[in-house]
Structures are given as C-alpha cells and as structure tokens.
C-alpha cells in the first residue's frame, strides 16, 4: 500500500519535476547527530562542478533539477545532472534490479564519469546500496555515494509498512516527539553507512541529513519562527508527506551542502520557490531553509562537512 501511495504521489510530483528540470536545463539537533558521536574525517569545500547521477523515490526525485539551479546560482557552471532513475516507492535494490539494457544508473557508473551517486532508501537494510557502491568504486575510486535520510511517511516509524493510520495530523507532533520518533531510523542509517564504509575500506558513503533538517524546520514552524509557513501541514501535499516547494528546496539545499561541502546561505531564491506563485515564500523563508540545511550538514558526523564550518 505504501508503494501504491508513493506511486500516486510520484505522478503528482512528475509534472512539477519536469517543469523544474526544464527550467534548470537539466542535460534543532536530533540524538542521531549528537556532537558526542565520533565525526568521520571531513574534507574541504569542493570547488569543481560535480557530475551527479540520482536514484530514488518521490521524496528524492525532485532534487536533481533544483540542485542544478542552485549550483548555477552559486557560480558552479560545470555542475552536471547526468541522469535520474525514478521509481515510486522504491528501495535502492529496485533501481539495481532494472534490466541492464535499461539500467541507466549502471551504464553511467561503468563509464567512470560519475563524481557523485545520490541514493534514497526507504528503510534499511537495503542491499542495493552496497551493490551500487561496489560498482561505482570499481569504475571511479574517488566517487562519493550519498544516502538521503527522509522524513518518516505518515509520521510513523514502521519498517513493515503494515501500519496505516486512519488520519494523519502533521500539525499534532511536537519537535520532541518528532526527534524521538525518528531517532531509531537515523541511528539505523548511520550504523549502516558506517558498516558499509568499513566494508569498502574507505569513506565513500555520506549521509544527507534531510530528515533532521525537516525536523528543525517543523520546530521553527511550531515556534512561529518560519516566515511564510503557518503550520507543519504547509510542508506536505498529503498524509504520506510528499513535499511542497519549501520542503523540496530544503532537501535540495541539504544535498548542495553535502555534495559541495559549502554553505548555501546567501544563494538567491531558487526557481522551485520563485515560480510557486506564493508571495509568502520569499527571501526570508529561503534564508531560513539555507541555514537549517547547512546546520544539519555541519552537525552530522557522516555528512563529510567539517564541524564548525562557517556559513
């Protein structure tokens, strides 16, 4: 049922994604990000445009086009979105299992011309992450693989996908409740990424802490400190939690921060917000989204961004 709901949401997103891609010429701290945890070795800012291939479901597929827009605005002219494998409600293994004659992700990785592979599992374990990582490193030892956290569908943590609430009130949970709810999910992802890096013998996989940035934004909304957003529901199109433009922008900023290891703070209003025809989604909101994304990346020990890095 979850996959069916997400496929429905994916169709809803498809037209918006197409417009964004066309327009961009596409060719509060949770326990899981605690400062007390060991931080993996970060590197400095990435100055060269990255060639990015993405695989994901509808909580991720909007990222490539928006990221291209942001990179261009940041003066990164040689950023390239190489392709997108989009499957509604998918686990990473489903992208791996696409037949070789149609598998654009494998084709791109085998060329050795991919700098960053972005993945977005639903829940773990997901053997597709390891399979893609090994193939990617075989053809480009310097590739980085990012694994995107998400915000829990239906605001519940259920790896069986059997629990389906009759109604979902996204405005109901407090920030503390959201952090507690997401804690095992975040911990599971961090443990999985660390174990894969150990298996691979290098830090090749990095976490994009989008889920934690979303909690921080929801906390700001609850406190009345999010310009242009009155309720938590303003972030979502439906009960599952498909993203409206402000949430899409936040997630893309998280990817920008992790991929380029530099702050998005100060970038102009992205097309995804500018073309939404909502005057409340302005530069003040944009600045907040940038700050939250950067803060999440800086404080996550697996993002690859140096702790204490300045905006």
Please describe what each predicted stretch is.
Residues 50-55, 59-142, 299:
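Conserved SGNH/GDSL esterase-like catalytic core that processes O-acyl groups on lipids
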Residues 13-27:
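Bacterial N-terminal signal peptides
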Residues 35-50:
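N-terminal low-complexity, Pro/Thr/Ser-rich intrinsically disordered segments
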Residues 28, 32-34:
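Boundary at the C-terminal end of the N-terminal hydrophobic targeting segment
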Residues 106-248, 257-259, 266:
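Alpha-helical cap/lid subdomain in secreted, periplasmic
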Residues 1-10:
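N-terminal secretory signal peptides that target proteins for export/translocation
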Residues 224-311:
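Conserved catalytic region of serine esterases and O-acyltransferases that act on ester linkages
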């Amino acid at each position: 049922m979850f996959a069916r709901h997400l496929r429905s949401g994916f169709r809803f997103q498809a037209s918006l994604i197409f417009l964004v891609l066309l327009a961009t010429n596409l060719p509060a701290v949770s326990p899981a990000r605690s400062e007390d945890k060991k931080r993996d070795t970060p590197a400095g800012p990435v100055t060269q445009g990255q060639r990015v291939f993405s695989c994901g479901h509808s909580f991720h597929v909007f990222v490539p086009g928006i990221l291209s827009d942001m990179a261009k605005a940041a003066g990164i002219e040689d950023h390239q979105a190489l392709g997108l494998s989009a499957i509604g409600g998918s686990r990473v293994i489903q992208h791996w299992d696409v037949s070789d004659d149609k598998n654009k992700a494998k084709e791109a990785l085998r060329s050795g011309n991919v700098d960053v592979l972005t993945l977005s599992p639903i829940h773990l374990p997901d053997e597709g992450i390891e399979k893609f990582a090994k193939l990617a490193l075989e053809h480009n030892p310097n590739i980085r693989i990012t694994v995107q956290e998400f915000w829990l569908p239906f605001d519940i943590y259920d790896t069986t996908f059997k629990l389906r609430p009759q109604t979902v009130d996204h405005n109901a949970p407090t920030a503390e409740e959201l952090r507690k709810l997401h804690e095992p999910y975040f911990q599971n992802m961090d443990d999985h990424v660390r174990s894969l890096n150990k298996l691979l013998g290098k830090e090749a996989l990095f976490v994009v802490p989008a889920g934690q940035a979303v909690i921080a934004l929801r906390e700001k909304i609850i406190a009345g400190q999010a310009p242009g957003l009155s309720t938590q529901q303003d972030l979502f199109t439906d009960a599952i939690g498909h993203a409206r433009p402000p949430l899409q922008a936040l997630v893309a900023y998280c990817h920008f921060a992790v991929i380029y290891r530099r702050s998005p703070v100060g970038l102009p209003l992205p097309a995804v917000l500018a073309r939404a025809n909502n005057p409340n989604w302005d530069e003040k909101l944009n600045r907040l989204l940038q700050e939250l994304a950067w803060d999440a990346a800086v404080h996550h020990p697996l993002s690859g961004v140096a702790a204490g890095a300045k905006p």
